[in-house]
Amino acid sequence: LHLSLRRQRQMCIRDSNLPHYSRSLLQTIEDIGRDRVFVSIFENNSTDASPMLLRKLEAELERRNVAHNINSTSMPSELGMWERIERLSFLRNQAMKPFYDQVPYGLQGRPFTRVLWINDVIFEPKTVHALLQTDGGSFDQACTVDYFWLGYYDIWVLRDKNQKTVRPLWPFFRDADDRRAVESRRPIAVNSCWNGMTAFDARWFSNTSFSARNSTPAKTWEPVISSLPRPIIRNDSSEKPVTLPLQFRTSRICNASESQLTSLDMHRLAHPRRPKIILNSDLVVAYDAPTYYLYQHIMRWRIIFLWHYLWEYWVSTRIFTFFTNM
């Protein structure tokens, strides 16, 4: 498991999240195995206590003999003048750089099976384990659901299986089957996602060829990456050429998130097949503790389901459809 974590000033980081974040991260590593995880953190230009807290985390990783690279630095002022997605793409690629430079063949002769990205969110180790086991662990990409006080947060990146946008208000999707899946907290096939925490089959980010894993259970819908030839390149007329390993990038034809473009490039490489991108609607992360408690606990109380019914079928659907579907 390769953990890639990125912190940077422009994302309004709250250093108050870092102690909980570090505890959850360390417990996750203990559960998975210290010798099976590589942690990469890239932090830049923070003006709060983040650098100090990251040094404490680094010391603890060293004490536990966990392979890691924590880079806390000040970036050139010119970087702040870059277009936002160009800047974020650069920073994400910096977080991935140790994956190629330090551990290109994995740890102790074992190739990595997953690349896990965790934003600056409140999360529990059980959420990581559940995400990695989405659909029996058979996926190209799997995502949690990230929340802010009103509801679902990452509407800019998430697209349903029909390429439609979603809304922040529960149950998020326009398609009836997808809405029912959210109501029953089941995984949902989507076109793209990120959502605070996302896991990839590591082969999407690997520059080393290796065969499909025998440990993956047989599924009717296998991860596309299991059978893609190497090397492979797509040179569409509309976009920049894409190849493996994936790189975060900008788009020259639309204003899209670097996170969404990663899913798009998976589609381009897999065409005419469809990559197995799954939203695990049962898994909650949030950007502050009160919101996390609200959606992880209070909104799961049985009495709240009456509010869900009244909101979905009467307020959201029948009265304010235009506004709630924006």
What residue ranges belong to the model's regions?
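Single conserved hydrophobic/aromatic residue that forms the stacking wall/gate
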Residues: 2-9, 13
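Short, acidic, metal-binding catalytic loop of nucleotide-sugar glycosyltransferases
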Residues: 23-36
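Short beta-strand/loop segment that forms part of the nucleotide-sugar
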Residues: 36-45, 73
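Active-site-proximal specificity loops/subdomain of glycosyltransferases
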Residues: 49-112
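Short aromatic/hydrophobic "clamp" motif used to bind/position activated sugar donors
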Residues: 115
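Conserved catalytic core of nucleotide-sugar-dependent glycosyltransferases
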Residues: 120-238, 310-314, 318-323
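Active-site donor/metal-binding and catalytic loop motifs
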Residues: 241-245, 272-296
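Short active-site alpha-helical segment characteristic of glycosyltransferases
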Residues: 255-262
